[in-house]
């Protein structure tokens, strides 16, 4: 019987991003720029919203840096790091359980940690 590989993921609850993002890569770049592995918003979903709906979320979304954070996995342990577009940390911060992370320092993630990229919230599920 094949064992399913454990797969950490982020769970979102917004109309402009998929409900679940699987952390399949060793390094996942997160931010507002569409080139990121995980872009906030998911532009394919965002484009389908009405202009009024888009405008409703724009003020929150502009507080997510173009390159905001990075999640890496080493030896089965996941880490999150606040990067920022210039590499000096994001303007509106990355948070674990409401604690703001120091820029450019990897923090270990635990199952059910509540993460925030600026105002955008998600939950980290270890598997």
Model-inferred region functions:
Residues 69-71:
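Buried hydrophobic-core signal for structured, non-transmembrane domains
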Residues 2-12, 27-31, 73, 79-86, ...:
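C-terminal boundary/linker segments immediately following FHA domains
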Residues 1-62, 74, 123, 127:
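Intrinsically disordered, low-complexity acidic Ser/Thr-rich regulatory segments
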């Amino acid at each position: 019987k094949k064992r399913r590989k454990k797969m950490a993921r982020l769970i979102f609850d917004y109309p402009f991003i998929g409900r679940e993002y699987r952390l399949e890569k060793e390094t996942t770049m997160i931010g507002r720029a569409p080139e990121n592995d995980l872009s906030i918003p998911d532009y394919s979903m965002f484009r389908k919203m009405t202009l009024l709906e888009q405008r409703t979320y724009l003020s929150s979304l502009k507080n997510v840096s173009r390159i905001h954070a990075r999640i890496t996995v080493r030896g089965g342990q996941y880490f999150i790091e606040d990067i920022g577009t210039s590499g000096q940390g994001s303007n509106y911060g990355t948070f674990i359980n409401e604690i703001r992370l120091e820029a450019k320092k990897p923090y270990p993630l635990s199952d059910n940690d509540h993460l925030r990229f600026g105002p955008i919230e998600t939950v980290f599920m270890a598997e």
